[in-house]
Swiss-Prot record:
This is Small ribosomal subunit protein bS18. One of its GO terms (cellular component) is cytosolic small ribosomal subunit. The keyword Ribosomal protein applies. The gene is rpsR. HAMAP family: Ribosomal_bS18 (MF_00270). Part of the 30S ribosomal subunit. Forms a tight heterodimer with protein bS6.
Amino acid sequence: MLKSNNTSETAAHKVGDKTAKKVFFRRRKGCPLSVPNAPVIDYKNPELLIKFVSEGGRMLPSRITNVCAKKQRKLNNAIKIARILALLPFVFQAK
């Protein structure tokens, strides 16, 4: 029992050590589609949907666009519907 108490003390000393590297955490920005006055996600709005599609025509992941999971699912469905209705191309042509 003394051994487990001793290890917790040494772990506490290591955490409080000034020579230890500080870990930098970047604060994640909020979802751009959840703010007030945000545009409505709709398949009939290709100008909005094109912002969430890469140059090659692939849907960008939420870790790049900072969109929350709920809005990401709505975006994916809207992009798929817009592609089927020929409002968005499946593959963008190289220039």
